C-alpha cells in the first residue's frame, strides 16, 4: 500500500521561506493594514538607501586595516542629484582623481574598486567583509592586488577607467545595487578582464545579491576568486566566461 502523500505546505508556511510579498491577504478591495504599512516602510527604506551618504573615509580606513594600500577618487557627478540624473557622469573619472591614479602602483593583476553605487548602505555593510574573505583566496593562487580604490559617485563602468589607469589585467568592482523592497542593502561584484573605457555589460561577470539574507560575504568571495582566476587564465570575462565555481552553501534538506 502506498504511503499517504505529504500534504502541501500552507501559504503561511511558504511565506516564511521568502521575503517576497506573497499571500498577503486582503481587506475588502485593498491590502490588510499590516501589509500596506510594511510595503510603505520597505519603499521608504529603499529610497533612503539610494540617497544615503557615503563615508569613503571610513571604508578607506577599514581596507587599510586589512593591509591594502587605498586611494580615494570621485566620478564627474558633482553630487547625488547629479549622479542620479546623469548616469554617464558616474562612469567618468573627475580630472583630479585621474591624477591620483597616475601616481599609483601599475601593472597589477587585479584592481579592487569599491563604489557607492545606488546603495551606499550596502557598501558600508558588506564590502569590507567581502574583501576580507577575498584577499586570502587570491593570495593562495598567487594573484596580486595592487591597490584598492574607493570611488564616490560611481557607476559600474567607472571601474573600466580606473583599471585602465592602473594597468590592471582585471578589475573587480564592489558596488551598491539598486535597492529592492526586500533588499535595500544588496552589494554587487562586477569583474572585467582587460578594463578600458567603452566596454559593455556583455564584457563583465556579475555576482549579485550579496547581503544578510542573500549570498554571504564568504560565498561571494568564493565565486569572485574563481571568476578572477579563470578570467585571467582564459583572458576573458562576460559572456565568454560561465560561473562554474560551485557553491559553499549547505544543501537544502530533502522533503
Swiss-Prot record:
Pathway: Amine and polyamine degradation; ethanolamine degradation. The keyword Transcription regulation does not apply. The lineage of its organism: Bacteria, Pseudomonadati, Pseudomonadota, Alphaproteobacteria, Hyphomicrobiales. GO terms for biological process: amino acid metabolic process; ethanolamine catabolic process. GO terms for molecular function: cobalamin binding; ethanolamine ammonia-lyase activity. It catalyses: ethanolamine = acetaldehyde + NH4(+). It comes from the Bacteria. The basic unit is a heterodimer which dimerizes to form tetramers. The heterotetramers trimerize; 6 large subunits form a core ring with 6 small subunits projecting outwards. This is Ethanolamine ammonia-lyase small subunit. The keyword Repressor does not apply. Its cofactor is adenosylcob(III)alamin. Keywords: Bacterial microcompartment, Cobalamin, Cobalt, Lyase. Adenosylcob(III)alamin binds at residues 156, 177, 206. It is found in: Bacterial microcompartment. Catalyzes the deamination of various vicinal amino-alcohols to oxo compounds. Allows this organism to utilize ethanolamine as the sole source of nitrogen and carbon in the presence of external vitamin B12. Binds between the large and small subunits. Its EC number is 4.3.1.7. Belongs to the EutC family. GO terms for cellular component: ethanolamine ammonia-lyase complex; ethanolamine degradation polyhedral organelle. It is an enzyme of class 4 (lyase).
Amino acid at each position: 500500500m502506498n504511503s499517504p502523500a505529504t500534504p502541501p505546505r500552507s501559504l503561511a508556511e511558504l511565506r516564511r521561506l521568502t521575503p517576497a510579498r506573497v499571500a498577503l491577504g486582503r481587506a475588502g478591495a485593498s491590502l490588510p493594514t499590516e501589509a500596506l504599512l510594511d510595503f510603505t516602510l520597505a519603499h521608504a527604506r529603499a529610497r533612503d538607501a539610494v540617497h544615503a551618504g557615503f563615508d569613503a573615509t571610513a571604508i578607506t580606513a577599514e581596507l587599510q586595516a586589512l593591509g591594502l594600500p587605498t586611494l580615494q577618487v570621485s566620478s564627474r557627478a558633482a553630487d547625488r542629484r547629479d549622479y542620479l540624473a546623469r548616469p554617464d557622469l558616474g562612469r567618468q573619472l573627475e580630472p583630479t582623481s585621474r591624477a591620483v591614479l597616475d601616481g599609483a602602483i601599475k601593472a597589477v593583476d587585479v584592481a579592487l574598486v569599491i563604489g557607492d553605487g545606488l546603495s551606499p548602505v550596502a557598501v558600508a555593510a558588506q564590502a569590507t567583509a567581502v574583501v576580507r574573505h577575498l584577499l586570502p583566496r587570491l593570495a593562495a593562487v598567487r594573484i596580486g592586488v595592487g591597490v584598492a580604490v574607493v570611488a564616490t559617485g560611481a557607476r559600474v563602468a567607472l571601474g573600466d577607467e580606473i583599471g585602465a589607469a592602473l594597468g590592471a589585467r582585471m578589475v573587480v568592482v564592489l558596488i551598491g545595487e539598486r535597492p529592492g523592497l526586500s533588499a535595500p542593502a544588496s552589494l554587487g561584484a562586477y569583474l572585467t578582464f582587460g578594463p578600458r573605457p567603452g566596454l559593455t555589460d556583455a564584457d563583465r561577470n556579475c555576482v549579485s545579491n550579496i547581503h544578510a539574507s542573500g549570498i554571504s560575504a564568504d560565498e561571494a568571495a568564493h565565486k569572485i576568486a574563481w571568476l578572477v582566476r579563470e578570467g585571467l587564465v582564459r583572458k576573458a570575462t562576460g559572456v565568454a566566461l560561465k560561473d562554474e565555481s560551485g557553491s559553499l552553501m549547505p544543501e537544502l534538506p530533502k522533503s
